[in-house]
Amino acid sequence: MLEARVVKRLGALDLAFDLSVGPETLVVAGPNGAGKSSMLRVLLGAVRPDSGRISLDGRTLFAARIDVPPEDRLIGYVPQDYALFPHLDGIENVAFGLAHLPRRERRAHAGAWLERLGAAHLAHRRIAELSGGECQRLALARALAREPRALLLDEPFASLDPSARRELRASLRRSLQQWRLPALIVSHDPDDAMLADRIAVMERGRILQQGSTAELRRAPASAFVASFTAPERETSS
């Protein structure tokens, strides 16, 4: 379980949030500038909170005298821009994050994750040749290949066309249901609520309301909250 209760002032933004994510998917929804990506940077360890506590599976990652480095937090991260290396092919990009493994094992491990995600055909493709959806699959494979205990995704579908967005949402939902990792997705798109077991709606650095998708649809705290809860989930085969 990923748990966080932190406060951080970032320029004009006062960021304060209290979240607990078990083996489920939490979608943090809100407009651009709400503080969603800043929240992810705090959880990852890229930005140090002013106060509070962050823990993962009972292990303290941040507290008054503890600040575990990002590379040791066992949190997978899929950035909005994918952060893939254009001079490497698909399997090399996935293997890049596996420096903790012996060199001879890295490609085999990366290839296994591409296979699991139905992306083995991308192993020897150059990044410039790939669509946004294909880049997203590689970024997800790279994050999961490190076998994290929690997964964070920053606007994972923002740069995709509507067709690719629907396909990737369905694929990611199936994968998250299979692995049962604590997963936190931030998004400004109300349609991404279909991925959620729970939704938290954020504005100006604060969580306004959080609960199950059914709870927020049934009793939203405001019209603003209601605008970020999608209609009934799409079903997938």
Language-model-derived ranges and their functions:
Residues 60-76, 100-103, 216-220:
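ABC ATPase NBD coupling module
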Residues 210-211, 219:
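ABC ATPase "signature
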Residues 59-63, 105-122, 173-174:
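Conserved ABC ATPase "signature" region
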Residues 205-206:
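Conserved ABC ATPase "signature" C-loop
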Residues 126-130, 134:
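Conserved ABC ATPase signature
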Residues 88-107, 116:
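ABC-type ATPase nucleotide-binding domains, specifically the catalytic core motifs of the NBD
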Residues 145-149:
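A short, proline-enriched helix->beta-strand linker immediately N-terminal to the Walker B motif
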